Amino acid sequence: MQFSGRIRKKLRLAGDQRNASYPHSLQFYLQPPTENISLTEFENLAFDRVKLLKAIENLGVSYVKGTEQYQSKLEAEIRKLKFSYRENLEDEYEPRRRDHISHFILRLAYCQSEDLRRWFIQQEMDLLRFRFSILPKDKVQSFLKDSHLHFEAISDEEKTLREQDIMASSPSLSGIKLESESVYKVPFADALDLFRGRKVYLEDGFAYVPLKDIVAIILNEFRATLSKALALTARSLPAVQSDERLQPLLNHLSHSYTGQDYSTQKNTGKISLDQIDSLSTKSFPPCMRQLHKALRENHHLRHGGRMQYGLFLKGIGLTLEQALQFWKQEFIRGKMDPDKFDKGYSYNIRHSFGKEGKRTDYTPFSCMKIILTNPPGQGDYHGCPFRHSDAELLKQKMQSYKIPASGISQILDLVKGNHYQVACQKYFEMTHNVDDCGFSLNHPNQFFFESQRILTGGKDIKKEISQPETPQHKPSTQKTRDAASALASLDSSLEMDLEGLEEYF
């Protein structure tokens, strides 16, 4: 198709105007989006952003940040999820638009607690660090200006005048490197971290910061900006949650699981009850291993433990009949009357299989669900051992599982950094004698099936898993399923007016 010169000019101007909305592949997210989007797109963008941030967290503890391997794997994740990452790529507008909108959606979900805010800020900072590291040098100054960072690169004459002082404060810079390196004049108060580390030259209240070090200042500014914005959003959240279209999604997005939900398995019935003791030591994650041990020792679990463990067993293949037999046998060993069990407990088991009440088929809990909701109290055994156990108790538990001392140290370091799922992944690698398990652990049932795949050479249960439905994200908890149902009940063509949310950011 050919266009006249006038039409080509109009098309070019329209493209220029769109690109002007997002001049760079990275930003400080200073202005919220104001367009209308469908509820379906709202939900999809939110889940894609969660996937990206989870990938950033996993890569950050698996690889040294900034290394070639880290950079290439992160770029691949960003490209796969269709977010922006490089300048001067074709079709820049849509990835940058997705990046912009999804960031603000997650602000609504992750402003609700200090733990959520801390996690969100850290992953967003790592994303910004990556994008800045591949930003062309000739784009840095305009990015700083657009981000309201008033740092000006000094002239070559000024740089030559202070060459010796700058190099003395930055040992990694030689004269040749400095010649091609931009140096920024930054107010002293913005460079305190560099000053404390004696990594910057100061003069008359200003720090002279080479480009390689300016990222530390940019990240500090971004952290402060985002932290304030999340606090503001948190104060306004009750008003946002009054919107019946948003409330179900936002309430559960922060601990949602976007992978396979393990609710329907082709291997149902292929696990026998006499296998469970053996499987618990070989293929159960620590959270389920401790629940099984507590059940065998005490012949009872409280409601939180029964729900977490019961749905896990359902997910690995126990039928309703097997589940009723398993729990009844164990509770009777604890001197419970069989009639009491039938009246007080069997209903709840049938309910979890979708045979009572609303006939809803409950799904096994994901790691995020276990970590972030219903913390265990005195006498409880549910929860995540890496999140809910103190360091000494966790150390003793790992020792009882025959984890070597070096592995325990690595696990405790990961827990100290709040990387609970990665700590569990390290436990998996230690107990299965693999250097790299090759997956990101997000679900206890995933742990089980990956374990079986390794132990059986991929010939047993793992092959029986039904494939996840790729077009849709399937939250793993009942509440998130309710959230998705609430959204699905609305016409997907209904539009979400993002401009109406502007005052909450």
Swiss-Prot record:
Any one Gene Ontology MF annotation carried by this entry is:
DNA/RNA hybrid binding
Q: Which GO terms describe its cellular component?
A: alpha DNA polymerase:primase complex
Its keywords, alphabetically, are: 4Fe-4S, DNA replication, DNA-binding, Iron, Iron-sulfur, Metal-binding, Phosphoprotein, Primosome
**Could you tell me which residues belong to the region Disordered?**
463-486
Q: Which domain of life is it from?
A: Eukaryota
Q: Where is this region: Interacts with PRIM1?
A: 266-503
* CDD domains per UniProt: PriL_PriS_Eukaryotic (cd07322)
Briefly, what is this protein's role? Answer: Regulatory subunit of the DNA primase complex and component of the DNA polymerase alpha complex (also known as the alpha DNA polymerase-primase complex) which play an essential role in the initiation of DNA synthesis. During the S phase of the cell cycle, the DNA polymerase alpha complex (composed of a catalytic subunit POLA1, an accessory subunit POLA2 and two primase subunits, the catalytic subunit PRIM1 and the regulatory subunit PRIM2) is recruited to DNA at the replicative forks via direct interactions with MCM10 and WDHD1.
List the PANTHER family hit by this protein, alphabetically: DNA PRIMASE LARGE SUBUNIT
What does the record say about domains? The RNA:DNA duplex-binding domain interacts with the template phosphates at positions -2, -1, 1, and 2 positioning its bases -1, 1, and 2 for duplex formation. Interacts only with the beta- and gamma-phosphates of triphosphate moiety of initiating NTP of the primer. The side chain of His-303 mimics a RNA base that would be paired with the template nucleotide at position -1 via a hydrogen bond, thereby facilitating the stacking of the initiating NTP. The interdomain linker provides flexibility in movement relative to primosome platform composed of PRIM1, the N-terminus of PRIM2, the C-terminus of POLA1 and POLA2. Together with POLA1 interdomain linker, allows for large-scale conformational changes of primosome and coordinated autoregulation of catalytic centers of PRIM1 and POLA1. It is proposed to move the C-terminus of PRIM2 close to PRIM1 during initiation, then move it away with the 5'-end of the nascent primer during elongation.
Identification of the protein by name: DNA primase large subunit
Q: Encoded by which gene?
A: Prim2
